[in-house]
Curated annotation (Swiss-Prot):
GO terms for molecular function: mRNA binding. Pumilio repeats lie at residues 563-598, 599-634, 635-671, 672-707, 708-743, 744-783, 784-821, 823-861. It holds the Pfam family PUF. This is Pumilio homology domain family member 4. SMART domains: Pumilio. The keyword Ribonucleoprotein does not apply. One of its GO terms (biological process) is protein localization. Present with 721 molecules/cell in log phase SD medium. One of its GO terms (cellular component) is cytoplasm. Is not essential for haploid growth, but may affect diploid formation. The gene is PUF4. The modification Phosphoserine is found at residue 256. It comes from Saccharomyces cerevisiae (strain ATCC 204508 / S288c) (Baker's yeast).
Amino acid sequence: MSTKGLKEEIDDVPSVDPVVSETVNSALEQLQLDDPEENATSNAFANKVSQDSQFANGPPSQMFPHPQMMGGMGFMPYSQMMQVPHNPCPFFPPPDFNDPTAPLSSSPLNAGGPPMLFKNDSLPFQMLSSGAAVATQGGQNLNPLINDNSMKVLPIASADPLWTHSNVPGSASVAIEETTATLQESLPSKGRESNNKASSFRRQTFHALSPTDLINAANNVTLSKDFQSDMQNFSKAKKPSVGANNTAKTRTQSISFDNTPSSTSFIPPTNSVSEKLSDFKIETSKEDLINKTAPAKKESPTTYGAAYPYGGPLLQPNPIMPGHPHNISSPIYGIRSPFPNSYEMGAQFQPFSPILNPTSHSLNANSPIPLTQSPIHLAPVLNPSSNSVAFSDMKNDGGKPTTDNDKAGPNVRMDLINPNLGPSMQPFHILPPQQNTPPPPWLYSTPPPFNAMVPPHLLAQNHMPLMNSANNKHHGRNNNSMSSHNDNDNIGNSNYNNKDTGRSNVGKMKNMKNSYHGYYNNNNNNNNNNNNNNNSNATNSNSAEKQRKIEESSRFADAVLDQYIGSIHSLCKDQHGCRFLQKQLDILGSKAADAIFEETKDYTVELMTDSFGNYLIQKLLEEVTTEQRIVLTKISSPHFVEISLNPHGTRALQKLIECIKTDEEAQIVVDSLRPYTVQLSKDLNGNHVIQKCLQRLKPENFQFIFDAISDSCIDIATHRHGCCVLQRCLDHGTTEQCDNLCDKLLALVDKLTLDPFGNYVVQYIITKEAEKNKYDYTHKIVHLLKPRAIELSIHKFGSNVIEKILKTAIVSEPMILEILNNGGETGIQSLLNDSYGNYVLQTALDISHKQNDYLYKRLSEIVAPLLVGPIRNTPHGKRIIGMLHLDS
């Protein structure tokens, strides 16, 4: 058929992008399909295609992996995925494309899009599907695209027919001869109906050609040679691709999972379409070029695109690959994977695609896929007059960029250097080069970033830094989205390695008030940093202090006392030195005591009030002789009051009083303490010295204490510490001393009963007499307090004395009778309703129930009628009801 007729047939095909159709027609006209030899060659190859097509029912297996892979085997390795810059509209035309009039949704091929490369390697999945599509029992494929008869699929060859001399395993790409033959077979004929035309259309897979090649070919291209001569010169052609500035290179192999070392992914082709077209002389008028294409612009960077294989472009953004803008209205699901070393935007191992990021100046040197030096530049179509970094970078010769971006490093965010680049043009981390070896197996063994059944998360690109920052916080990291500590890190991952070492989390809840659960919180937590630094400094200081103490303690490990003779005093106030001397006293006994006594006797008062020295004095007082102890007593006696009031000295002085064995020593102590007895009795530390004197001295020696207390009885008895001294006097004093003291106290019993501390003195008198079975002062106390029984019973401290009397069997009945006779029903009712009196009433009921039924009956008759109303619901009311057995 003629090329003109073929062009008319293509124009009749519905849903065909005009740009693509013109491009295909131009290519077919260049190939001179009218030639009989061409038809014979194409038909022969087409027959082979039709024979092999029965084994490939649907698209190749690499496009739709076996369902089991999505479940148990993890997600598709990211190096096998395609990175396609997208736009929120259905088919994602790039914003900078030259032809703004190109259709957006009607062209599944996205013919107006920028050139894109696709990695279509079938090797990783041939083991699972063997090149055939997954089918049901009836032979019908599960995938609707596979069932589409209009999608005529070429067979998957074990070796690429184009690269027979390169010894490179073939990929899923098909040679141009196969494509041409299949295209001619699939085109509608004159006799077919319109619906058959639509069903017979298929998308073709072409090798990477620049838009300039296709546009020039579409504008009345004239061939300088016939097709037969061109076919003979295909293998000999060495001229560059069409266009002075274009150098086409075709991908021949992708990453392989087997142990075969992978060769370069981009190598100069031996039988590429660019070489086939290199011998063609293009003569296109400038006017036609202006009329049929977009307005002429200056020369733009060389870019290369591949047709979308077997189903058009990706219909959704790829959320895993960086640089894909997402719809801003998409749900905010994109959080960092919790798995370590997982593939994601901020992980250690980054995804890779042959389509490099638009900001890359050339094939990235850090790509994990081994590449030879390639001049291919991948970038959006920019204004050549623009001063942006990306454009000026691509105009450098030899593929060696000299922009500031290269000086800063491959991971610097481009839009921070040059504002002409938008936020969607952000670079991403790339693994170091693999040095022409297959990627390590662990590269594909990490867990998927999301479960198999969870849909990919859509998130606007400009939200990624915020999300990464928030996710860092969700993992216990208080990091900022931007940090001056990592100037070369990618935005959103700037503080990924800056993990918190401290445990402070100050301001966590405060920050959450200003954001949605911390997802978009970029506030700086300076408090955390300060606290972490403080904690670190404190830890270092503590460690240094512990180390110093260990060294000091080890200093005396093997030491002997003779080494420190003459400098013992310097060891007494040191913790380890003091312990060393005490140990020497235990080992050497009197010998060590003599040496220590001679060097420390002049510093006795100083050591007795020292936090460490007082322990040495206490140990020394036990080891020295009586003469030496008397010397120490005489030396320290003028300072007994000062020593007694000191928290450390009081212990040393008490030890000295315990060690007294002679009257001389006792007299020295008595003479020193007598003037200060009342003062010491009321002191927190001094009262223990007075009590120790009552315990260790003879009655005649501590008589000075009874004399001082008798003169200041009310002052000492109503004091917090003095009342304790007075009780010790009742314990250690003689009968005469105690009776004299009790007479003094009995005259003050009314005041003492109502005093917070004095009431304990009155109770102690009753207790001591009960122990001695002598109740002289007890009866006297009851006799004095009975007329005020009801008044004292409702008093906070007086009620304690009344209860003590009721619990004393010898005087309990007289007190109960006093309550019944003098108080009567009114007095008992006041006790029942009082917070303190109810305890007195409960005690009276309990004691009378055990000892005197008559008194119990009388109390019951008075109390029972009063237990009505709210009183029954009170805790004490319920207890009284239980005691009277009124709850039944």
